[in-house]
Amino acid sequence: KRIQLLLRIPNLPDDDCPEGFSEDCNIVLRMEGYKRSDYEGKEFKPHWEIGKELGIFDAERAAKLSGAMFALLRGDGARLHRALIQFALSINSEQNEEILPPHFVRPDMMMGTGTLPKFEADAYKFRDDDLWAIPTGEVPLTNLHAHEILSMDELPKRYMAYTVCFRREAG
């Protein structure tokens, strides 16, 4: 019971972290690669509209297959998705070891990252197995060395992964 109570204590923010209750309270610390003036005063379409116009997103068939809030990429959209994954992994491969982790983990791995119990309602659990579908690649990556003591000369560990993320959320 004590462990269950301790798991519900949130992480405390750093004292330098600004207080805020909405996105309007966010503070921009720095901007890289573009000037705000390049984008101010211009209208932009949401990505789902652009994707539909280009014929690379098919929200109707995705909804037919799985319900609302799912994606189906076609043709160039599917190829673009694959290319972006390959690009991201490739540009980071010199500094990081690529890992292809399991998509399902034990409950203690979900607890080790703070996913359980806090986000239990947003997570998918297998009915007949004591396994959870990973909500993000961070869960298996941060637990690669769970219950181990690493020496300083083994650090830092730098990992990267592309994974499917299973979680109930919309927006």
Regions found by a protein language model. Name each.
Residues 1-37, 52, 56:
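N-terminal alpha-helical targeting/anchoring segments
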Residues 30-171:
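TRNA-recognition modules of translation machinery and tRNA-sensing kinases, especially anticodon-binding
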